[in-house]
Structures are given as C-alpha cells and as structure tokens.
Amino acid sequence: MKYDVIVVGAGSAGCVLAARLSEDPGCSVLLLEAGADYPDMQGLPGALQYGHTRAAEAQDSPHNWALTGTITRLQKPIHVAQGKVVGGSGAINGQVMLRGLLEDFESWAAWGNDAWGYRKVLPYFRNMETDLDIRDDFHGANGPIPVLRRQQELWPTIQAALHQAALALGFPADPDMNGPESGGVGAIPMNNPDGIRMSTALTHLNAARHRLNLTVKSNILARRVLCDGQRAVGVEVESGGEVFVVEGAEIILSAGGLKSPHLLMLSGVGPAQALRGMGIPLVHPLPGVGQNLRNHPIASVSMRVKEGVDLIPDNRGTRIALRYTASGSSTRNDIMIMTNAIYSPLSGDVLPERTIRFSCALELPTGAGELHLASTDPHEQPSFNYRYLEDLWDRQRMREAVRLCLRLAEQQAYRDILTARIAPTDQDLASDDALDTWLLKTVGTARHISGTCKMGPASDPMAVVDQYGRVHGVENLRVVDGSILPHVTRANTHATIIMVAERIAEWISSASGHSAIA
C-alpha cells in the first residue's frame, strides 16, 4: 500500500500532524513510532501519566532514547533524555506550556520566514489551547490542550518564596507569562490538569484513532528515507529484526532535534564531504543538517534547607519562574530562574540532604553546537556536542544569573527556609574565572533541542527546510519538529513545536498548501 503521507516520529509534532492530516478522509496517513504505544489512558504507565514523576527520563527507562552527548570541554558525556513512546518528549516532560516571545517569531520573519511573524502564529497558539485562567484576545478557549496556572494560595513554600524574594528585589509580578509583554515573576502556564501530563498523544491523536485512513504503528525503527533521484518515495523501516519498505507520496520527519537530522544524513541529505566519507550515497548536499544545535544551558545553585520545611513537591507541578533581561542585553527575557526541591520522593529523586536548587536557564544563548554521524548503522546514535558556554557573552550572563540567585536567597522570604549554600562554594565565587570554571564543570541542559534542520530561504546556505518545512532540494520530503526552529525560543519549546505542527498541517491540507497533496 502507498500512503499519501508517512509521518516518522509520534512526538509532540507527529501526533498533531497525524491527527490533523487524517481529518481529510481521502488522505491516508501512516504514523511511525520507534517506541511503545498506549492507546488509552487506562493502559498508560504512571511514569508517563503523572506529571509529578520524571521516572521516564531515567537512562534505563524503556520510554527514553537514553542518548549521550557532550556538554562542555570540562565534563564527561552526559545523559540526554528524549522521548521514545507515542507522545514523544511531550510524554516525559515537565508539562510547561510556555510560548516563545513575540520577538522570537519576529526574528524568524526577519530571517526570511515571513509566514512566522507573531501576528501570524498567534491564532494557532490560541486555537490549540483552552486557557482555564485567562480570557482575552491572546488566549484560546476551545482548543484541545488545557492550560492553567496554580493559584497563589496553593503554591508550595519554596515556590512562594521565590515569588516574594523577586518582588523584594524590584522585579515586577507577571500574571500572564504567555502575554505579548510578559516579564518578571509569576506562575508558569502548565498543561497538566489534575496532575496528568497531557501530551499530544492524549490531546490530539487519541481522538483520531478511530479513523480508517489513519494507521499508527509503534515499535518501528525508521532506518532512512528512500529517494528516487531527488524525490522522496518511501521509508526503510525495521521491526522485529526484519527490514521493510513503506511507500508514501509525502514523507514528513518529526523525529525531533537529534533524530531528524540523523535520519536525513542516513538518507544522503546533509554535509556532502561527511556523507561521502561515511560511504553514504549523496542525494542532496545541505551543509546545515546537524549544525546550529541550540538549547538552554542551566546552572544550578543548591542550598540546604531547614528542618521542618516541606520539600514534597505539589503533585500538580506548581512552578514559579522569574524571567528578566540580563544587564547590557538587547534581548528581552534572556534569563529564567526557577526553584525546586532536589529531595523529592514523588519524582524518585531522593538525596540524603535536605536541599533545594535555583535553576538558571540561559534562554537565548549566542553559542551553538553541532551533530554528526558516528556510524551508518541506524541503531547507533549520532555524535553531538552542545558547546555550552564557549561564548564569552553566554558566560557573562550566566555568572550574573548565579549571583542573582545568591541575592534572592538572602531575602526575607527565605530566612525561615534556607540554612547554608552548598554550591557554588566561596572558592567558586572568588572571581569571574573561578565561577566560569565552576559553570563549565557543572552546567546542565534543558531538553529544548532546536535548530539542527533550521528553516530559512534557499539563499541561506545553512537552511535545511523552507518556511513550509520542505527540505531544500528534495521533493516530497519535509521536516516538522523542533529541529526546524531557526533558534531556540526564549521559553520551553513544547508549545511552539505544537504550534508549528498545527500551522504546517494546515498548509499541507489546504488546496493551495505548498504540497503534493491537494
């Protein structure tokens, strides 16, 4: 059977695409997923269902690709969690439903992607959500994804303290972090009503499963896209040790920021010299495949907590965050600070000390990493390096964020909560150089991988897809996931990725929609 559309990867984008494209009964859709599928809530494991647990991120979890990557020159390779299940990373994430900033999308448009300015993407953000707290022109009321913020009287002690401390330092209160002029400290919008992690498998795909024109296949590894000349015609897949070919009129890669560029390179689309060196026949040279790897570096300031302070987190995932603009920065809200308990029986993260950490995320880093093929074997992961904090401006902003955390901890709101600082030590704080060394040794990462198949016009030599997700130089092949974001957003990327999938699905489905499908 030849499908009209094959979607590779049932993650946050893939589930949306499959659900939307199959709304047309004349369009046959095959959704492929390497991980397991749980088609109803009753069979969904608790590690995926409940937002208070991060067990599915563990390296030994069957729902995690459990990749390893390089983060800085002073650290050993780190574990990188990526969802391997229908629902993708949205099925194992922290349930933050925070949009990119207005300026993020205006930058996309300025870089030659004029269909992605803020006014053009706002309707898709609105249509995909039902905001349970705010009713205005910037928020939706009839979408499939519930969005809510925890009311102040329900905030746990350590979350409320961050809010009070930030206000004491003069930062404004931010009642709506998804508003166009947001900034300051407030409750983060979440997509976990009653503590349930609402991935797009639940919000989009499940309601479409009954359609006869939609086929969902789990535990299927995509090995490569097959091309006839420079036209995609199918996907080579593997299941149960056997290799098969499935044919499609259009192939869409939605395998994520690491797996989509990996599949492109295995398919002969990418840096020509590198592919030839691996013995892969070249379909089309695109030097940007795997480059421009963007994410959010995170530094953690840890503090010991007094006896009697409740460190059991709210099982509904309450989160308070401070977003601000670093000194001398021209990019608004380029730092985010959050706080949470490290000691957490609910999440399975139990340490002997009573500890909390302030997490400082660099939301718009200047530096970028890259991804390369390590093997032609599709079972072997690609090699990737975040190259965090190699840029002086990135280090400068992170130093400032760490020092701000120390000032927050000194405020009255924390007097009855904290007893002592654990890290960084006084020695780590003795100078800029010492703090830089500590940061390079300890910095962590978010799971917001972006940019490795970035969108842009054909005149951009590093662009991999055009603004409609179509791979430059290869017919009937698209990439639709976080990898096509030109830069990481100044927010968790989950909401933006869903918006991107909704928008491109509409283009594909429309009669004038830049596709072989009409």
Identify the residue ranges that each predicted region occupies.
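N-terminal redox-cofactor-binding region of secreted/periplasmic oxidoreductases
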Residues: 1-518
